[in-house]
Amino acid sequence: MTAPVGKDLERVRAEAQEAVRRLREQRPTLDDLSIDVILTNARSHYAWQDKPVSTELLHRLYEITAGGPTSMNTCPARFIFVTSDAGKQRLAKSLKAKNIDKMMDAPVTAIIAHDLEFWRDLPFLFPHEDRRPHFEGKPEHSETTAFRNGTLQGAYFMIAARALGLDVGAMSGFSNEIVDQEFFAGTTLKSNFLCNLGYADESALFQKLPRFPFDKVCSFA
C-alpha cells in the first residue's frame, strides 16, 4: 500500500475531516439507553440460551472492533472464534473447572490474542512512514505494545458485541500457556483473555456488584 502524497494527501485528509464533521452533526452523543446497553447497565454473563450466533454477525463484530484506535494503527489483536465441539474440547483443557461449563454452553468463545510481531504489517497499516525500526529487534517493547493495544481492542470487541445485541462474558480463569500451546504453537501469537458470546440466560444473574464513586478513584493534576 502506497501512502498518498501532495495533492492526493491533501484530498484524503480533507475527506477524513469532513466525514468527522458530518458524523458529529448527525448524532453528537449516544442516548442514555444506548450507554446503558454497552456499559452502565451491561452485565457479564455466564449462562446462555441455546441460540446460535451467525457468522455474518461475527464478521460485523470484527469490522466494528477494527475501527477502534491503536497506537500507530498497530492493530495487534487477533481473534479466534471457537464454535465447534472439537475446538471447545481443546479450549477446555486450559480452563479452571468452574469455567468449563460456562464456555461449553456459550455459542461462541473468542480467544483474544495479540501478535508479538505485529510490526511486520506496519507498511500496510501505517504506510506514510516506516515504523518497523521502532520494534524490530526490541522484543520487550514489541510485547508491551502488543499487549497494551491488543487489550484495548479486546475492550472495543466487548462493547461492539453489546452494541450488536450480543451478551458477553469475559474470562481470565484459564492457563494462557495451555491456550498458546493448543492454538498458537509455532506462531508469534499469545493469548490475553477469553470472551464468551451469545444470548444470555439472565435467570443465572445475581445483583450488579458495586463500583467506586468518582472521588474514590479520580483526581486532577
Predicted segments, located by residue:
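C-terminal domain-closing interface element
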Residues: 200-221
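Short Gly/aromatic-enriched secondary-structure transition segments
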Residues: 78, 124-128
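Short secondary-structure transition/capping segments
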Residues: 86, 181-184
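N-terminal amphipathic, basic helical "cap/leader" segment at the start of enzyme domains
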Residues: 2-119, 220-221
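Small-aliphatic-rich amphipathic alpha-helix that forms the alpha element of a beta-alpha
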Residues: 65-67, 110, 129-182
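Short, solvent-exposed amphipathic alpha-helical segments in soluble enzyme
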Residues: 96-98, 127-129, 185, 211-212
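Short, well-ordered secondary-structure micro-motifs
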Residues: 90-92, 121-123, 181, 205-208
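A glycine-rich helix N-cap at a beta->alpha junction
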Residues: 100-103, 108-112, 185-206
